[in-house]
């Protein structure tokens, strides 16, 4: 049953939810989303709602804006629409003040994100993506926290060339951003080849099923040309309609015991239920996870997903579409800060949501099946799968695939490997790269190239369990540094951990420059969330497997204070931990920080409960 506290809202009558007792929820809506722009304005819907309706299925003024060569930017409205095409308009904030002083336009560029369901690319595709990076994106690829690639620094005049190159790799950027189902993640545990294959196929099927059908992407970026034959789809969005979704929607597929996709942090998830031979017998469906919040606004919060029920393999796609369309129809289109699925479930209750999903599927969901996760990190080094193929997971700091002066030559090394590799490459949800499906006879050749380019230079347990978002200088939302700051912080904390004999202890640590939570800091044992220049909120107490949220431990900690704040906790952990106890569990059991149940409870009983 639903054990979450509902949001108190003034809108609509409340109803009792069976089994919840005194908890009361709003009555779910019965009308469909408004589809006329003027009606959307009159109803007080968010600006993005009438913008989507009037966009001509995501065209807007993008085609004309690309022809305006006097500026490196596009209009503000088109900046919202271009997200659906997989892009964000950004500028270099390091030089923003200098350019303003000189009365110059901001140094605009675009971040381009690909759609790669399950994060799998062939060596041929890798080489094309590498060439795009060296030609248009500052000789760097960035593996994201959601199993795809991003390019940064692509200027407007190179957008169509970049898109054409991506298309030549038989890839695209459709729905990589925006109010749609975004890139679908899939488990990458190489030891379970059979289960992974099924998980990957489900991810691809969901991605294809929930993909917007508009022809705007190919029309605008490729001038309507096709690399592969086929007729254009009719100009209609059979699943989304003109309004698409109220907000972003993220889907993942997990295979226990590894939770490297962080299933509880996403809107929709499928947990593989395995028999004794590691065969998939069906899926537990999870709903209502999400990380983003706004500082100082307690009606916004991160939330871990609920297990909605169990579906047979043949019903998984129906369940995915049903969950997404209920969110399409029930989600908040007036306030984008409360528009994610997590708030929809808090508003109407899990039981009502389940009933509507079952109605749309046409059958009852089964009771959830038992499952166990043992962590949300990657398995580094060589692993042999149950099919006899070999897989090498490389640690890539913050996912930044580039040649580092005096350090690993990731871009050059992986390019050289792609030239001889006979398998594929797999991106992980932790921003790392797997050289996958290597025949036993090719391992020595791969190892030699890995050594030549320094791709496996030693990294501590803490570093291997770290993540950071991009933040400054390109992200317009960043309040503080993240990717550029985390390596220095890790060096400081490594010294502290070694002093307490904890250098080999896996502890998850994640950093983001703002509370939107792209690196999922609220489900890491140590989470840093930017508040301002060199200032962070420090969160502690999340579960090592990503199933429990953290709690705010210290507000506005300066960068210079973080090590000193954590060191006494490390000392206590080294002295008083129980066998096998993880750091996040310890700080709760030892009484340093309160446990977060979920959702709105995230903002309750914050701060240290006792001195370390």
UniProtKB/Swiss-Prot annotation:
Highest taxon in the source lineage: Bacteria
Presence of keyword Nucleotidyltransferase: no
GO cellular component entries: sulfite reductase complex (NADPH)
Keywords, ordered alphabetically: 4Fe-4S, Amino-acid biosynthesis, Cysteine biosynthesis, Heme, Iron, Iron-sulfur, Metal-binding, NADP, Oxidoreductase
Short name of one Pfam family: NIR_SIR_ferr
Main enzyme class: oxidoreductase
Residues at which [4Fe-4S] cluster binds: 469, 475, 514, 518
Cofactor(s) needed: siroheme; [4Fe-4S] cluster
Region (Disordered): 1-26
GO terms under biological process: cysteine biosynthetic process; hydrogen sulfide biosynthetic process; sulfate assimilation
GO molecular function annotation: 4 iron, 4 sulfur cluster binding; heme binding; metal ion binding; NADP binding; sulfite reductase (ferredoxin) activity; sulfite reductase (NADPH) activity
Classification via InterPro entries: CysI, NiRdtase/SiRdtase_haem-b_fer, Nit/Sulf_reduc_fer-like_dom_sf, NO2/SO3_Rdtase_4Fe4S_dom, NO2/SO3_Rdtase_4Fe4S_prot, NO2/SO3_Rdtase_4Fe4S_sf, NO2/SO3_Rdtase_FeS/sirohaem_BS
Catalysed reactions, semicolon-separated: hydrogen sulfide + 3 NADP(+) + 3 H2O = sulfite + 3 NADPH + 4 H(+)
Segments crossing the lipid bilayer: none
Pathway: Sulfur metabolism; hydrogen sulfide biosynthesis; hydrogen sulfide from sulfite (NADPH route): step 1/1
Binding site for siroheme: 518
PROSITE patterns: NIR_SIR (PS00365)
The protein's Enzyme Commission number: 1.8.1.2
Cofactor remark from the record: Binds 1 siroheme per subunit.
Keyword Cell membrane: no
Record's subunit section: Alpha(8)-beta(8). The alpha component is a flavoprotein, the beta component is a hemoprotein.
NCBIfam families, alphabetized: CysI, PRK13504.1
Task of the protein: Component of the sulfite reductase complex that catalyzes the 6-electron reduction of sulfite to sulfide. This is one of several activities required for the biosynthesis of L-cysteine from sulfate.
Similarity comment: family membership: Belongs to the nitrite and sulfite reductase 4Fe-4S domain family.
Listed name of the protein: Sulfite reductase [NADPH] hemoprotein beta-component
Species name: Methylorubrum extorquens (strain PA1)
Taxonomic path: Bacteria, Pseudomonadati, Pseudomonadota, Alphaproteobacteria, Hyphomicrobiales
